[in-house]
Amino acid sequence: MTRLPNRLPRMILLIGVMGALLGCATQKQHTFTYSQPLLPEVASGYADKPGWSSKKFAVAAANPLATDAGYQILKAGGSAVDASIAVQMVLGLVEPQSSGIGGGAFMLHHEGKPNGKMQAFDGRETAPLAASDTLFIGKDGKPMPFTEAVIGGRSVGVPGTVWMLELAHQQHGKLPWATLFQPAIALATDGFKVSPRLNTLLKNEKNLKADPVAAAYFYDAKGDAWPVGHVLKNPAYALVMQRIATQGAKVLHEGDIAQAIVAKVKNHPTNAGLLSLQDLANYQAKTRVPLCFDYDVAPERYQICGMPPPSSGVIAIGQILGILNNTQAPQMPLNASKQPTVDEYLSPEWLHLYLEASRLAFADRAQYVADPDFVKAPLDDWASLMDPLYLTQRSKLITDTSMKTAKAGLPTSVRAIKTSVNNRYAPMPDQPEYGTSHISIIDADGNALAMTTTIEAAFGSQQMVSLNQDGKNTIGWISVEQRINRFQFRTNWQRRQTDCQPGRTRQTTTLKHVTHVGDR
């Protein structure tokens, strides 16, 4: 966990990273020239990180090349949002299995000045206008197998990551927009070394070769994944980066690139999709009001803020912590040996309470949380799900034995709704979720952001678009539109709050938080 100087708000950004670079000084001029690091660290698998300390700025991302791009932007005087753009564009190139310009993202941004504003930016994908709640029902009337639904055009929706970044930059950018694409352009043009992680994923992927463009880009003539250290170039990605840099996010949503994306989706030989030029042209990123709750751990009071629905993370965390506070958990040791060491296993007693609280929270999440543009919150306020009195009632359901499958609760405002059969929602079943990356950044002015960016499944919908006919120059990934994992595979009698509807954003588990300690 990165520690911040006292003059800045003390925050905790929940991150999942493999690399971090910290800066101890920054330049005042707002100019930037990208230089590629000579020996970037690459890794595959888990690496324990002890944490770092910085007095000026910090950036953490899942790939050292992306982290370095953000670091150089911050060192040149860029803002946290500036750095996030550079990081994301490089991630889309070097880690296409996790995120990219064809995906969706959330960003939580906090201004570093006193009483600074916190904002939530929503760039998650939406369902095509032609979508319906039977999109993932097969000809036999049964839900499609997950893999069959995902791979191809059917699962692709309207991407929003670049639109969201442009919106955030308009409000919080310092360096010129075009400057921020230099790292991705340079790496795509000159090439980057295939990492062990990318090589491993390519070798284990069974379906990616079915797409001729992806096969030509990621595999050699024998069909083997490019080896670790192979220099992979993508001049067409560089071209698209250059066009976004000079023309803005709109180049992905209109004109020849948009036409190529739509053609790829609609012309899939076995699993065509519904994405249209109108869908791309109509997309708008949104700003939302962050959702916050208080959490007391003597002698401190924490205010924890997160992304509101359609993200479900902050509600789930708020419920889990609130329920646990009504149990013996706060007085119990965390580990089995009753010693405050990090090397011990969690005690069975504490872990039982945590798991039961999590069951209750996820039951409510499955029942109520969805796109707020389509589904009303209980009491018209999502915070009602974290009401202390309600969580006290929920905590009484925990006993010494597992409740197995928990049932959703009934906040007061929901009781009237539940009496109407026509308005009754079935709970949302869990489904696998992969293909996601996280970015955490603090700039020299104390502005902080947490951004989760995703294409939902490994390599998204496993469709790649080419700018030419030979299939060698590619523009990047059309993501598996994230609704595939939360818009439901369901039979007609099961009405759910996450049903697929035109223009709708599905519920997501992505989690990004900023925590204030007292008045810091």
Region spans (language model):
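Bacterial N-terminal signal peptides that target proteins for export
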Residues: 2-13
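C-terminal motif of bacterial Sec signal peptides marking the signal peptidase cleavage site
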Residues: 22-23
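Noncatalytic scaffold domains of N-terminal-nucleophile
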Residues: 28-68, 72, 80-248, 252-254, ...
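Internal maturation/activation junctions in enzymes
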Residues: 36-38, 331-454, 468
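Feature captures eukaryotic membrane-trafficking machinery centered on endolysosomal pathways
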Residues: 65-68, 235-272, 418-477
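Active-site rim segments in enzyme catalytic domains, especially the processed small/beta chain
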Residues: 93-100, 104-110, 114-120, 271-276, ...
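Catalytic loop of the DD-peptidase/beta-lactamase superfamily, centered on the K-T-G motif
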Residues: 301, 307-312, 321-327, 453-458, ...
